[in-house]
Amino acid sequence: MVRSVWKGPFVEGSLLKKADAARASGRHDVIKIWSRRSTILPQFVGLVFGVYNGHKHVPVSVNEEMVGHKFGEFSPTRTFHGHSGDKKAKRA
């Protein structure tokens, strides 16, 4: 379900402060965030965020196509190791 337009996008307050500080300083360090639910805004383009996936911070470099999506979409929380193979097919 999509968020109401009149409410506007959700962004964690601390995330905005960190992004503004990174822009002002001009440093290109990874900004560590835990807020996977925050929406990516146009002012985040060009910055690199470390989005926490429950295990580690996955580096996400924000570009224009990501605007409007959530940070959590770009940091998978589960790893797929594949299905087990058919043992009969391997022997033949």
Curated annotation (Swiss-Prot):
GO BP annotations, alphabetical order: ribosomal small subunit assembly; translation
A cellular component annotation (GO) from this entry: cytoplasm
InterPro entries: Ribosomal_uS19, Ribosomal_uS19_bac-type, Ribosomal_uS19_CS, Ribosomal_uS19_SF
UniProt keywords, alphabetically: Ribonucleoprotein, Ribosomal protein, RNA-binding, rRNA-binding
Molecular function GO labels: rRNA binding; structural constituent of ribosome
Superkingdom assignment: Bacteria
Pfam short name (any one): Ribosomal_S19
Entry's family note: Belongs to the universal ribosomal protein uS19 family.
Free-text function comment from the UniProt entry: Protein S19 forms a complex with S13 that binds strongly to the 16S ribosomal RNA.
PANTHER family hit by this protein: RIBOSOMAL PROTEIN S19P FAMILY MEMBER (PTHR11880), SMALL RIBOSOMAL SUBUNIT PROTEIN US19M (PTHR11880:SF8)
Protein name, UniProt field: Small ribosomal subunit protein uS19
Originating organism: Nitrobacter hamburgensis (strain DSM 10229 / NCIMB 13809 / X14)
Lineage: Bacteria, Pseudomonadati, Pseudomonadota, Alphaproteobacteria, Hyphomicrobiales
